[in-house]
């Protein structure tokens, strides 16, 4: 019985970690934007996106979906528009958010996305957090069995 619990726990760890990885940042192109600048995924931190455009990005339970909150002030207190949930597209395909074109940068340590030569090699803090939470939750459930 202990062997089965251990095996299930190991499989849940592998599943949680493999599903927690996804994207580490974004490239934004449009008026006042530098299309070569990578905006790293910093969970909920106010960041400069383009000239006079700031934003917060928060991950969701799906590693390819994010909530975007655009602001017009450097303190991220005055919203430009309502929060939008966006889905990163595979193979570095860009998508539109209002007048901006966004390209998600995949995590090169992830097998669930296509590698990119411009991708950073670090693991996303948000992905690590999601994976840790998923693992701890599954471990607690298996401990109760």
From Swiss-Prot:
Keyword flag Signal: yes
Residue spans of biased composition, Low complexity class: 108-126
Domain of life: Eukaryota
Glycan-modified residues: 34
Chain positions covered by the region annotation Disordered: 107-126
Post-translational modifications: The GPI-like-anchor contains a phosphoceramide group, rather than a phosphatidyl group.
Prodomain positions: 118-145
Alphabetical keyword list: Cell membrane, Glycoprotein, GPI-anchor, Lipoprotein, Membrane, Signal
Record's bilayer topology term: Lipid-anchor; GPI-anchor
GO cellular component, one term: cytoplasmic vesicle
Task performed by this protein: Binds F-actin and nucleates actin assembly.
Name of protein: Ponticulin-like protein B
Gene that this polypeptide is encoded by: ponB
């Amino acid at each position: 019985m202990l062997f089965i619990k251990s095996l299930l726990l190991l499989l849940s760890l592998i599943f949680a970690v493999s599903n927690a990885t996804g994207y580490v940042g974004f490239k934004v192109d449009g008026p006042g934007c530098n299309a070569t600048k990578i905006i790293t995924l910093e969970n909920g931190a106010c960041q400069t996106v383009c000239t006079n455009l700031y934003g917060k990005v928060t991950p969701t339970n799906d590693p390819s979906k994010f909530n975007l909150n655009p602001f017009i002030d450097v303190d991220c207190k005055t919203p430009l528009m309502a929060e939008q949930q966006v889905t990163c597209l595979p193979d570095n395909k860009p998508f539109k958010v209002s007048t901006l074109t966004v390209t998600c940068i995949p995590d090169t340590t992830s097998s669930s996305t296509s590698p990119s030569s411009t991708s950073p090699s670090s693991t996303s803090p948000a992905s690590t957090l999601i994976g840790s939470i998923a693992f701890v939750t599954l471990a607690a459930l298996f401990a109760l069995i």
